């Protein structure tokens, strides 16, 4: 009898776990970005409650197809993977290895929207220059916790599924600040609501 009870409990746990993953990625399809990577899909929950201007710009760029083909040009093991240079980072058209990481979109830079949301594994933050109001299209995904970024960079969301694919993104050279030769790319980015 205890074997049956244990088996039922295990089955219930698995069912609840699967349901939780599905719910997490579909909680708000309008604010879920799906990144198709070489090792699988990554679902990002983007948070207009934390950074409304940044989220609006990301969604606009996703819907325009601007992130499709864009390289993960700076990837530092144990820290983060950076992408989103839609001007110089497109691996399918106009990739500029010398300038990747310096570009943005044709839209204006955004004012900082710092929050108390911490930078932990899976957090998605906006990349910027030393000017806190210079974020535009580039973003990064944390491999590990980064408390030194808290309150210094805008958090736009988090990975809700597919972190295993993020972990497999080709890493760069630490000696070259994470610059990646022959980098991996975002094959395609979509808003989940647009795929239904």
From Swiss-Prot:
Return the PANTHER family for the record: PEPTIDYL-PROLYL CIS-TRANS ISOMERASE-RELATED (PTHR45625), PEPTIDYLPROLYL ISOMERASE DOMAIN AND WD REPEAT-CONTAINING PROTEIN 1 (PTHR45625:SF4)
What InterPro entries does its record include?
Cyclophilin-like_dom_sf, Cyclophilin-type_PPIase, Cyclophilin-type_PPIase_CS, Cyclophilin-type_PPIase_dom, Cyclophilin_A-like
Q: Give EC number(s), comma-separated.
A: 5.2.1.8
Query: Per its database record, what is this protein's job?
Result: PPIases accelerate the folding of proteins. It catalyzes the cis-trans isomerization of proline imidic peptide bonds in oligopeptides.
Which organism was this protein described from? Brucella abortus (strain 2308)
Give the SUPFAM superfamilies listed for this entry: Cyclophilin-like
| Record PROSITE patterns | CSA_PPIASE_1 (PS00170), CSA_PPIASE_2 (PS50072)
Pfam families associated with the record: Pro_isomerase
GO biological process per UniProt: protein folding
Q: Which UniProt keywords apply?
A: Isomerase, Periplasm, Rotamase, Signal
**Domain PPIase cyclophilin-type intervals:** 29-194
Q: Name one GO cellular component term.
A: periplasmic space
Q: Which reaction does it catalyse?
A: [protein]-peptidylproline (omega=180) = [protein]-peptidylproline (omega=0)
**Span of the signal peptide:** 1-26
Record family assignment: Belongs to the cyclophilin-type PPIase family.
EC category: isomerase
MF term (GO), any: peptidyl-prolyl cis-trans isomerase activity
Name of this chain's protein:
Probable peptidyl-prolyl cis-trans isomerase
The listed locations are: Periplasm
Which lineage do the record's taxonomy fields give for this organism?
Bacteria, Pseudomonadati, Pseudomonadota, Alphaproteobacteria, Hyphomicrobiales
